[in-house]
From Swiss-Prot:
EC number: 3.5.1.5
Entry's localization field: Cytoplasm
GO biological process assignments: urea catabolic process
Matches recorded under NCBIfam families: PRK13203.1, urease_beta
Stated name of the protein: Urease subunit beta
GO cellular component, one term: urease complex
Disulfide bond sites: none
Primary gene name: ureB
């Protein structure tokens, strides 16, 4: 292998294969663009974004790691979300969870 070389598998690679997916319409009611990154807890996204936050608790964007989706002012677009995996613990963001997504608290 040459340093920095990529050795890619032939064919398509499906991201998050077999994971549950939900579709959601999201509108930006603000006067500034809003960008949401791939692993941001979508329910805690900018309050200017209009969508059902209860429905998407524990979900993130179904996009490649390190990428994002931008919502321009007044724009409504459909996004696909997938649930967080692993320990399903959320810390930080806007501080609305700060622990297990699966707890009943």
């Amino acid at each position: 292998m040459i340093p920095g070389e990529y050795q890619l598998k032939d064919g398509d690679i499906e991201l998050c294969a077999g994971r549950e997916r939900i579709q959601l319409d999201v509108g930006n009611t603000g006067d500034r663009p809003v960008q949401i990154g791939s692993h941001y807890h979508f329910a805690e996204a900018n309050p200017a974004l209009d969508f059902d936050r209860v429905k998407v608790r524990g979900y993130r964007l179904d996009v490649a790691a390190g990428t994002a989706i931008r919502f321009e002012p007044g724009q409504t677009r459909s996004v696909t979300l997938i649930p967080f995996a692993g320990t399903r613990e959320i810390y930080g963001f806007r501080g609305e969870v700060m622990g297990s997504l699966d707890s009943t608290n």
